[in-house]
Amino acid sequence: VDRRQRQMCIRDSLEAPVQYAFRLDDQEIPVNPLIGKSLRLEYLGAIHCTHCGRKTKTSFSQGYCYPCMQKLAQCDICIMSPERCHYDAGTCREPSWGEQFCMTDHVVYLANSSGVKVGITRGTQVPTRWLDQGASQALPILRVATRQQSGFVEDLLRSQVADKTNWRALLKGDAAPVDLAAVRDQLFDSCGEGLLELQQRFGLQAIQPLSDQQPVEIAYPIEAYPAKITSFNLDKNPIAEGTLIGIKGQYLMFDTGVINIRKYTAYQLAVYA
C-alpha cells in the first residue's frame, strides 16, 4: 500500500485492544492489521498548518504556523496551564472559542501510564485523552464546571501525585497495576481542605466528586516492546521504517525505534505498507 497525503494523525477507539487508524486526509486506514509487518513513513519535505493550511518551515505547538500559534486561543499558554486562564480579564484571544471549549464541563482523572498521574480533559474527550496518553488504567474522580477551575483542582492534586507521563517508561513495558480508587480516596483525604476551599469559591455544583465511577482497564495492540528506546526524528532523517511491533498512545513502536505521530501532525508524509 502506498498512501501519500498532506497530514496524518492517529484515530483511536476504546476496544480490547485499542483500535488505531491512520487518518489520511479524508480516509482512514486501520493500523492494527499492520502490526508484525514492515511499515515505512517518509517525510516529503512540506509542513502545512493544521488551522489555515499555510506552508511553514517549522511546526509550532504541534501543527501550527507561527502566525496561528501567536493568535489562536488553542495555542495560548493557558492550554498547557489552565489555571492561568485570562478569559475573565477580557484578554482571551478568541472569546467565542473559549466559551465553547473552556467554559464547559471538564473531568479531573487519575491515569496509570508510566505510573499514577493526575490530568484534566473536557468531558467529551473521555476516554480519548486516556488512549492518547497510553494509560493502562484510568478513573474519573471529579467533574468541574470550567477548564480554569479544573486547572486549580489539578494544581492542588499534583502536590501529591505526578501530572506528567514518562514516555520512555511508557514504551518499556506495562505499568504495574494500581488501585486507583484507593489513590482517589487518599487524595480526597489529604487534599480535602483545599477542595473545600475551591468549592466555597466557585460553588458546590462547580466541583463535584465522582465517587461512584469505576476504573477503566485499557489494553494496547503490542506484540513486543522495543529492546532499546530510540526515537525517530523526521527533521533529521526523513524516513522511519522497520517492523511495526506495537502501538501505544501516540507512539508507533518499531523493532528499529519509536515515533510520536502527534509531533508530525502537520507534516506531509508518504506511508508504505
Regions of interest found by a model, annotated:
Residues 34-90:
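Cys/His-rich short segments
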